[in-house]
């Protein structure tokens, strides 16, 4: 990760409006991963990541920051919901499965990168196998015949290779030997994922090396053989060693909905495993060793980012030890009408841009005017204030409602409007959403 914090924030700004403090915090944390790797080995072992707690209402960009960060980081990344886990001893997933899933994600990411690296060699090998199936070797009886045959075969082979690359042979059917995949689906109760993975690996290895002849069209066969050749060129043991190092040194875990496992004040109840989940998370965040399919993974240098709305609880309701392990606190602000206005226009592939592109597929043009966008932003803010504040997600509901009629009759409208776009202005927004926004009972159930 060689991007500077400023470059990371700039990239996040393309997709997320506002929340500068949160962007700066994650940008610094991400850059510190790179800085740490430049240190001498002795000092590097002592530098631990500063974990982050993001606090803010729902729909303001916490999860979106995590999603975009995953794409930027080019590092093993996993997003989990804290509510999915239970205390050890209860039915459900235990928190150690977070690291096992992160290890799987790292292996998958590195395998994809390695397959891209060997792709050209795999394509050449796959083409040769397809050509062998298309052009069986003729039998020869003398050396002179063999020389003439070789020259003729070489010319024919080059001609067929050219036709294969141009796609002229795609629909031709051939018989070819491919690996016989052994797929075993094992249904297991929650919490037994590790045993299930081991059993699946065992059955997969038992079937390794088995081959079977199949009749396929050239296009399908080429893809199957290319994947097979790429897998053969990838060194699995080396890949596992790299993945293990990537998890330990660069891994990032985003734990969403952390507030849902916080004990709410002095409220008692039957949900005994809430605090247990927090206590199980402690050693994971502090640093422990977890057994995974890659081997033993040390979690000392994995970066943890936790987030929660904290509507019904406060960060201080988390157990004190967990609070101490999330030293960087970032508060995300609730969205204003101006933020809603910017969200509708500024991000890369904004909501308005998406709807325009979707309707364009049917030949219908729609145009969002400035006053229409402003009115839409105001209604989103008003409905959030009057009912539940769900942040930017309110815009999805409003836009679906606003364009419902247009989406339903897009094909008919395209033929009547020709090239002239349907203009979405303030009057259009008021006529479709005004009454619903004013009537609190209706907006509570419909918007």
Swiss-Prot record:
Main location: cytoplasm
Keyword Cytoplasm: yes
Record GO cellular component, one term: HslUV protease complex
Localization: Cytoplasm
Keyword Cytoplasm: yes
Membrane-spanning parts: none
Subunit structure: A double ring-shaped homohexamer of HslV is capped on each side by a ring-shaped HslU homohexamer. The assembly of the HslU/HslV complex is dependent on binding of ATP.
Sequence similarity: Belongs to the ClpX chaperone family. HslU subfamily.
Protein name: ATP-dependent protease ATPase subunit HslU
Organism this protein belongs to: Pseudomonas putida (strain ATCC 700007 / DSM 6899 / JCM 31910 / BCRC 17059 / LMG 24140 / F1)
Lineage: Bacteria, Pseudomonadati, Pseudomonadota, Gammaproteobacteria, Pseudomonadales
């Amino acid at each position: 990760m060689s991007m500077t914090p400023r470059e990371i924030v700039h990239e996040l700004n393309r997709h997320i409006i506002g929340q500068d403090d949160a962007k700066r915090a994650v940008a610094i944390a991400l850059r510190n991963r790179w800085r740490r790797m430049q240190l001498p080995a002795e000092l590097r072992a002592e530098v631990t990541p500063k974990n982050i707690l993001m606090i803010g209402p729902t729909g303001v960009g916490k999860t979106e920051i995590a999603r975009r960060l995953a794409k930027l980081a080019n590092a093993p990344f996993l997003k989990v919901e804290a509510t999915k886990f239970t205390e050890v001893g209860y039915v459900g997933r235990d928190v150690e499965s977070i690291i096992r899933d992160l290890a799987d994600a790292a292996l998958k990411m590195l395998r994809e990168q390695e397959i891209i690296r060997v792709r050209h060699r795999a394509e050449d090998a796959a083409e040769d196998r397809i050509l062998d199936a298309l052009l069986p070797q003729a039998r020869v009886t003398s050396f002179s015949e063999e020389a003439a045959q070789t020259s003729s075969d070489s010319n024919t082979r080059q001609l067929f290779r050219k036709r294969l690359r141009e796609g002229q042979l795609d629909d031709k059917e051939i018989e070819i030997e491919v690996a016989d995949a052994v797929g075993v689906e094992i249904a297991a109760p929650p919490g037994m994922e590790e045993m299930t993975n081991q059993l699946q690996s065992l059955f997969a290895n038992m079937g390794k090396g088995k081959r079977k002849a199949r009749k396929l069209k050239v296009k399908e066969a080429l893809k199957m053989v290319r994947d097979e050749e790429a897998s053969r060129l990838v060194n699995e043991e080396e890949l596992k060693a790299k993945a293990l190092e990537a998890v330990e040194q660069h891994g990032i875990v985003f734990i969403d909905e952390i507030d849902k496992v916080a004990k709410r004040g002095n409220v008692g109840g039957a949900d005994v495993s809430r605090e247990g989940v927090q206590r199980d998370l402690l050693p994971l965040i502090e640093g422990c060793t977890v057994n995974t399919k890659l081997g033993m993974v040390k979690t000392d240098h994995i970066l943890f980012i936790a987030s929660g709305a904290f509507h019904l609880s406060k960060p201080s309701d988390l157990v004190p030890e967990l609070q101490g392990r999330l030293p960087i606190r970032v508060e995300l602000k609730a969205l204003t009408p101006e933020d809603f206005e910017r969200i509708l226009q500024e991000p890369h592939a904004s909501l308005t841009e998406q709807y325009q592109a979707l309707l364009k597929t049917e030949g219908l043009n729609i145009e969002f005017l400035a006053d229409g966008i402003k009115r839409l932003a105001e209604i989103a803010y008003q409905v959030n204030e009057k009912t539940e504040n769900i942040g930017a997600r309110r815009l999805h509901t409003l836009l679906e409602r606003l364009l419902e009629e247009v989406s339903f009759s897009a094909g008919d409208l395209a033929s009547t409007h020709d090239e002239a776009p349907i203009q979405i202005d303030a009057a259009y927004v008021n006529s479709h959403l005004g009454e619903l926004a004013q009537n609190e009972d209706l907006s509570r159930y419909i918007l």
